């Protein structure tokens, strides 16, 4: 176990939109430290998003990510030989990172098109409350609801 709590690092905002959330999305898309490629992908996806939603790209991105953010999740807890899936509220920073992770995973799981297009499509779906990332959120919520009986095991 750690001696003290891990320090939360501040992510600098991205150069074009001057927004921390866009910067986090870029870092999530990035592979092998190739940030400039990740930036191109995200900025093209943002253009695609604003084109499809007819809204400001930043506003649309924030809305899409808010739609995917989970409220509760389940965590395993061992109680006397049995492992229970205990529903727990998700902390604020984790909500955002889970939403970003699910959106990028959903985009990567699609085949046959450029990543910018797939990410843009997934962001549009998230904005409209449809798509794979929203389905993932609903699955997590359903799992928490099914295990609500074990909520008293919270720590």
Swiss-Prot record:
Keywords per UniProt: Ribonucleoprotein, Ribosomal protein, RNA-binding, rRNA-binding, tRNA-binding
Pfam families given in the database record: Ribosomal_S7
SS bond partners: none
CDD domains assigned: uS7_Bacteria
GO cellular component: small ribosomal subunit
GO biological process, one term: translation
Ribonucleoprotein recorded as keyword: yes
Molecular function GO terms recorded: rRNA binding; structural constituent of ribosome; tRNA binding
HAMAP family recorded: Ribosomal_uS7_B
Subunit: Part of the 30S ribosomal subunit. Contacts proteins S9 and S11.
PANTHER family: RIBOSOMAL PROTEIN S7
General function of this protein: One of the primary rRNA binding proteins, it binds directly to 16S rRNA where it nucleates assembly of the head domain of the 30S subunit. Is located at the subunit interface close to the decoding center, probably blocks exit of the E-site tRNA.
Family: Belongs to the universal ribosomal protein uS7 family.
The protein's name: Small ribosomal subunit protein uS7
């Amino acid at each position: 176990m750690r001696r003290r709590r891990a320090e939360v690092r501040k992510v600098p905002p991205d150069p074009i939109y001057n927004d921390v959330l866009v910067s986090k999305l870029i870092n999530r898309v990035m592979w092998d430290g190739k940030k400039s490629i990740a930036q191109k992908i995200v900025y093209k996806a943002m253009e695609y998003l604003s084109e499809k939603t007819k809204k400001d790209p930043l506003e649309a991105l924030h809305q899409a990510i808010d739609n995917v953010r989970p409220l509760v999740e389940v965590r395993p807890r061992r109680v006397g030989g049995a492992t229970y899936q205990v529903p727990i509220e998700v902390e604020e920073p984790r909500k955002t990172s889970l939403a970003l992770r699910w959106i990028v995973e959903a985009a990567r799981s699609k085949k046959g098109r450029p990543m910018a297009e797939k990410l843009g499509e997934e962001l549009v779906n998230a904005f409209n409350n449809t798509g794979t990332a929203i389905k993932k959120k609903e699955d997590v919520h359903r799992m928490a609801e099914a295990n609500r009986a074990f909520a008293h095991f919270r720590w």
